[in-house]
Amino acid sequence: EGRARGPEYVHTVVSCYKEAIESVLDGSFTEEKKDKWDERLSTVFNRGFWDGYYQGQKMGEWTKDYGNKATEKKVLIGKVIKYFSRLGVAEVAVEANTFVKGEKLLITGNSTGAMFLNAEEIRYELNPVDKAEQGWRVSIPVPDKVRPNDKLFKLVVN
């Protein structure tokens, strides 16, 4: 999986597949879990889901639409400037788009991979704010190490 796809795609697909395999092996597989995995998988690049060639379908029969059917899309916000390891906080430059408290974010980078988080807190000049404006440098708590020049995106409903 993941040929020519972003780190968020690889992270989501591999996580879902791993959880599915583990649940089959430990006997905890349910239709509810399958539905949750399908929902998560639908957030990243896909052309719809089908039963595959095992059900006798041929190429071209598996989707009615052309292109990506992901339910979420990435919107570039900016980049990481610095990571403060003792605080678990990243300083980010808000360059392309704004974001608000509570939005779903994604940080990607060559070493970072894909890090999903919610904007639970935003600080501008040490003060809490509800919205990060273009041109600002803000700090946000992050769950793990990020690196300078990692890209920051918000995930919005497609």
Spans of model-derived segments:
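C-terminal helical cap(s) of enzyme catalytic domains, especially alpha/beta-barrels
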Residues: G2-S42
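Beta-strand/loop-dominated core regions that host nucleotide or nucleotide-derived cofactor-binding catalytic loops
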Residues: Y9-T12, E19-S23, G27, K64-N158
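Accessory interdomain/linker segments of ATP-dependent helicases and helicase-like nucleic-acid enzymes
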Residues: D35-L87
